A protein has these predicted regions:
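Generic signal for short, ordered secondary-structure residues
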Residues: 27-28, 60, 116
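Bacterial N-terminal signal peptides
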Residues: 6-15
């Protein structure tokens, strides 16, 4: 009986440690509460750029047209974020690009980790949090 209880407790502890929280504030929550803040727009566009990069990567093998669509979106979102950043903070194109591409790469890595963890757990790279963010990004760019 003690062994069974030990196995159950160990399993619960293991499962709690393996479940990670979504690494971001959902874009839906962020944009709902701060629609007029240009900094939030910059961040949102940068997140959408990173998510588009992730979507392009996971689509590439099965649907190159879809991957290309997301690659174009990545560029459009990053360009929009750079333009806003440049105008808001009065920095050069090069400085805005350097600042935002560095952050975009870090965000893309978090999306990749989240998607890969989702795939391990469910067989799909897109969990409900990623789908929620994708819905917000789709709102900004209509294909």
């Amino acid at each position: 009986m003690k062994k069974l209880l030990g196995i159950i407790v160990f399993s619960l502890l293991l499962s709690m440690n393996s479940v990670k929280a979504y690494p971001f504030v959902k874009l839906e929550d962020l944009t709902t509460n701060s629609t007029e803040d240009p900094s939030i727009s910059i961040y949102t566009f940068n997140r959408c750029s990173a998510l588009s990069q992730f979507m392009s990567a996971i689509s590439y093998e099965r649907d190159k047209n879809l991957a290309d669509k997301y690659q174009k979106r990545q560029f459009l979102f990053l360009t929009a974020a750079i333009d806003l950043h440049k105008n808001l903070f009065k920095v050069s194109d090069d400085k805005a690009m350097a600042d935002l591409t560095k952050v975009q790469r870090q965000i893309a890595e978090l999306y990749k980790e989240e998607g890969n963890n989702s795939y391990i757990r469910t067989g799909s790279h897109l969990n409900s949090d990623l789908k929620s963010d994708l819905k917000i990004c789709n709102y900004y760019i209509k294909d």
